[in-house]
């Protein structure tokens, strides 16, 4: 994918952010199924996700775009494999997201309420991007 950094460099930046900022939320985008992605590479991605413990992630499948260098690469990944890998990464990021959110249960946090939600609730985000819903009586 022509990234200009390694996973070790990325982890170093994440570690520095977590050391500098209490309760920082580290989120990411993760593409699965890029051409030539081997089982070994995918498994390394899963381990990396577990190790970094992202607060949230947008997981998506590579899709071939005509005229791009990646579209011309051999070993395009099958839709079934991309779907399976996507589900695995989503499950892992849901675990780490839940772990992150659960750290704040019972804590008082600042919330910016921006919109009404369903059933008469208000919805907002904390400083570290956790979605919160409360009843009107608490606003």
Give short role names for the model-derived ranges.
Residues 1-56, 62-81:
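Conserved non-cysteine loop/helix-boundary elements of the Radical SAM core domain that shape
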Residues 72-136:
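Terminal RNA-binding accessory module
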């Amino acid at each position: 994918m022509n990234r200009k950094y390694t996973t070790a460099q990325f982890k170093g930046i994440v570690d520095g952010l977590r050391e500098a900022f209490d309760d920082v939320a580290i989120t990411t985008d993760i593409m699965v199924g890029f051409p030539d992605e081997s089982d070994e590479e995918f498994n390394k991605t899963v381990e990396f996700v577990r190790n970094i413990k992202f607060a949230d992630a947008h997981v998506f499948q590579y899709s071939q775009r005509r005229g791009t260098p990646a579209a011309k690469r051999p070993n395009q990944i099958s839709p079934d494999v991309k779907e399976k890998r996507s589900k695995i990464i989503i499950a892992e990021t849901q675990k780490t997201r839940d772990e992150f959110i659960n750290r704040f249960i019972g804590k008082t946090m600042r919330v910016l309420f921006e919109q009404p939600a369903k059933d008469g609730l208000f919805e907002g985000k904390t400083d570290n991007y956790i979605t919160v819903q409360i009843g009107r009586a608490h606003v």
